[in-house]
């Protein structure tokens, strides 16, 4: 499984950390009290495609597999100081979840909790995916009329967001998983 956490301390130092052992319980191998991952499944085990071209994500010594993990820290363009931290679990849809949350905060004016809870959507180029039960029939029909296949599916993000509003930090935890927001006064 994959987890994400966002943290800010009293000095404004920010962390966005996404960690994964791939599938539930990873490789199911315990070493020194922790589970080893099975991230090798992120590689393409075929070195060449049907046309004989090398696949970029093929297994090679010293190489890391491609990943969709996208822990994100947003910096204020004027001061260069961190003003937001966010990320999510969710496999190949992580980038969609983070992009949706950033757009929700910056352009739709949502607060951190609203952005984390907003309906999920994404595209692979061949299909458009909408979070099941979150988009009405006219919206789905309008998207389908534009060409790509539209599929309603479960999109269980787990987005965690911290964003600075004035001199305070606001948090949001995705209700689709067991995330939470906590604050401590020094």
Show where each model-derived region lies.
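Proteins synthesized as precursors that undergo proteolytic processing into mature forms
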Residues: 1-153
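Cofactor-centric catalytic regions
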Residues: 135-186
């Amino acid at each position: 499984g994959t987890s994400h956490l966002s943290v800010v301390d009293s000095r404004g130092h920010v962390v966005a950390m996404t960690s994964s052992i791939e599938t539930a319980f990873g490789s199911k191998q315990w070493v020194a009290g922790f589970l080893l991952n099975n991230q090798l499944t992120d590689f393409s085990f075929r070195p060449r495609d049907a046309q004989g071209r090398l696949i970029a994500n093929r297994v090679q010594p010293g190489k890391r597999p491609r990943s969709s993990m996208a822990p994100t820290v947003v910096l204020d363009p004027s001061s260069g100081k961190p003003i937001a931290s966010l990320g999510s679990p969710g496999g190949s849809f992580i980038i969609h979840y983070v992009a949706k949350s950033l757009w929700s905060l910056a352009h739709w004016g949502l607060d951190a909790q609203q952005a984390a809870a907003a309906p999920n959507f994404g595209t692979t180029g061949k299909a458009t995916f909408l979070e099941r039960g979150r988009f009405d029939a006219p919206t789905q029909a309008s998207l389908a009329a534009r060409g790509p296949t539209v599929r309603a599916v479960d999109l269980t993000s787990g987005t965690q967001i911290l964003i600075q509003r004035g001199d305070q930090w606001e948090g949001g935890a995705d209700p689709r998983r067991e995330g939470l927001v906590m604050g401590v006064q020094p």
